[in-house]
Amino acid sequence: MAKYYCILFDADNTLLNFDAAENKALTETLVNYGIEPDAETVQTYRTINEELWRQLEKGQIRREKLFGERFSRFLKTIDAAGDGVEMNRFYLEQLSTHPDLMNAEVLDVLRELSEVATLAIVSNGAQMVQTRRLAESGVMNFMEDVFISEKMGCEKPNARIFDAALRALGVENREHVLMVGDSLASDIQGGSNAGLDTCWYNPNHAENPGKVIPT
């Protein structure tokens, strides 16, 4: 008998290859705005973006601030002119067109799991971007529902997004729920905050600093 009757998945870098999609979308955005997408420039953006996402996950800023500031800070850092808000909008549109899967086995694994458990997605991504990427990737063929933080009004690792997802799915016994994701800070900590078992998707065998322990 299966232990888990409900499995919640993160989206980016768990089911969908966000790194590949980001590389494509960022390159397309920089080229569109006349900025050379060399390694140093790309890393400058990523450093700014990652710091803002960490602040978001800690509840220090809201999503609107992240989207409104990341490209504005980037342009200021590289001393380039432009509208950061408009640049962010263009980037999100480009990102939504890249539904790359993490690997060729993703859909087969989801197909098998969907036969024994209810599957759903809990994502911190942007509503428009994630809805399109998930649909075009084929992932949604196996999902009961998808819960995206922008629409839900809270971000992982806040337990409220998991609470709302489980209510919508009609799940009461959390002993039979598993959260799967690549991020210790949002997925594993979030699942733990909600009283769920967790599985750290770690294909690159990164070291766990030990602060957040998956079950």
Predicted segments — roles?
Residues 1-7, 20, 31, 107, ...:
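Asp-based, Mg2+/Mn2+-dependent phosphohydrolase catalytic module
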